[in-house]
């Protein structure tokens, strides 16, 4: 897993509408790169599924030694789950 640590200073916060496969992936890469990520999906069930998948992905990366527990928590804290636009 390669995460770029070069962040455009004008893109420290991004919003993702739609937490399907692509939305979840984009959100995770952005959060792991240091961006604050606001995520929204019209279906609450998709937000819950996304949270569960994020936790599972970060747990796997931590267990494999790719990231530390502190990094995992920092990534999770960069997510802002939005239930309305």
Positions of predicted regions on the chain:
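NAD(P)+-binding Rossmann beta1-loop-alpha1 motif at the extreme N-terminus of oxidoreductases
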Residues: 7-60, 64, 80
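A structured beta-alpha segment of the ubiquitous adenosine-cofactor-binding alpha/beta core
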Residues: 61-85
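Intrinsic disorder/low-complexity segments
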Residues: 1-7
């Amino acid at each position: 897993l390669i995460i770029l640590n070069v962040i455009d200073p004008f893109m420290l916060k991004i919003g993702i509408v739609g937490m399907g496969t692509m939305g979840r992936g984009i959100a995770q890469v952005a959060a792991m790169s240091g961006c604050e990520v606001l995520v929204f999906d019209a279906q609450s069930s998709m937000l819950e599924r996304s949270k569960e998948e994020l936790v599972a992905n970060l747990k796997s990366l931590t267990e494999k030694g790719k990231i530390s527990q502190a990094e995992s928590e920092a990534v999770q804290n960069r997510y802002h789950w939005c239930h309305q636009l």
